[in-house]
Amino acid sequence: MNICDLAPAYIRAISPYQPGKPISELAREMGMDEQSIIKLASNENPLGTSPMALNAMSKALDEVSLYPDGSGFELKAALSERYGVTSDQIVLGNGSNDVLELAARVFLKPGASTVYSQHAFAVYPLVTKAVGGIGISVPARNYGHDLDAMLDAVAPETRVVFIANPNNPTGTLLPADDVLRFLERVSPDVLVVLDEAYNEYLPPALKGDSIAWLKQFPNLLITRTFSKAYGMAGVRVGFGLGHPDVAGLMNRVRQPFNVNNIGLAGAVAALQDEEFVKRSYALNQAGMLQIVTGLRQMGIEYIPSYGNFLSFRVPGNVKAINESLLKQGVIVRPISIYEMPEHLRVTVGLESENEKFLKSLAIALETTEGAAADTIPEMAVSFPKVASGGTA
């Protein structure tokens, strides 16, 4: 018998998560200079990292021989002050993915189910399957969550509902009132995980007061991350906010030192750097307008997005178009694993990166066999130039 046959069948059935292609990998494959490649595949911050966070992390290098504070006291204190919660309502994670996995480990067992939307974050089914749970994918409505259908899908064995707002990879946004009504209607015996990884990219008028809902709904867990607007994806820091009893259970099963010294120091400093987050938001607004304008000029359908990315429908052979982009040194994200085989997702980058993407896409559409020529206007496209400090 092969030793691997002893692993549970539900583990052996899992397909590994496929992240965006690294720049170094494409450089090796194509024999390219890494400096000539742009990566717009993983929703990373094109501005880099908060300078205050970088400074704090640099100082923390002197203590890498020591274990981190397993309780994350200073970061929890900073989060408590920022969000008006108590430290016992907080669970820290090695990125918000870690927090999602902790929720599954605590509340699921073989045969229990989770409910999530079609076209939602791939980690939801992964963490469900990893503990032997059953994932219920509810058909999307206009590429977003159909909350009424998701409520109907909740079964007696359902323990967790995942809601991404904004949603990745489609960028759709649920009005805060709709989410609140869902919380009021769903069974209090079901944990609702509200994944707000892209919250900082929302216009202020569209940000719901979800954290205030924690006082009313002990079955609500809100997850956020330092990977996106704070530009700290490489050091992996995320957090969850919930009822003290829920956070307490999750803290029982997390790894003792799941957030490292560097990440803890950087996150505390990043919370103080409000100017960097404002710049990230403004750049994203301007870049989104730049990309949307370019796609419109090419007659490309796209899904309006409230994140720092945009999914668009490719008129033709998606694989061939993506290969052409790669050969031109542009990495975007195929999203067939999200049941969107005709789409690609692009991260909003710097103005120059967005311009290179748009020009490369136009070339790919013009030169790739199988592209739908009737959707492609003349290729002498003048792409918009938008100042990085502007808004859309």
UniProtKB/Swiss-Prot annotation:
Disulfide bonds: none annotated. It catalyses: L-histidinol phosphate + 2-oxoglutarate = 3-(imidazol-4-yl)-2-oxopropyl phosphate + L-glutamate. The modification N6-(pyridoxal phosphate)lysine is found at residue 228. Its cofactor is pyridoxal 5'-phosphate. One of its GO terms (biological process) is L-histidine biosynthetic process. One of its GO terms (molecular function) is histidinol-phosphate transaminase activity. Keywords: Amino-acid biosynthesis, Aminotransferase, Histidine biosynthesis, Pyridoxal phosphate, Transferase. Pathway: Amino-acid biosynthesis; L-histidine biosynthesis; L-histidine from 5-phospho-alpha-D-ribose 1-diphosphate: step 7/9. It comes from the Bacteria. Its EC number is 2.6.1.9. Homodimer. Belongs to the class-II pyridoxal-phosphate-dependent aminotransferase family. Histidinol-phosphate aminotransferase subfamily. This is Histidinol-phosphate aminotransferase 2. It comes from Nitrosospira multiformis (strain ATCC 25196 / NCIMB 11849 / C 71).
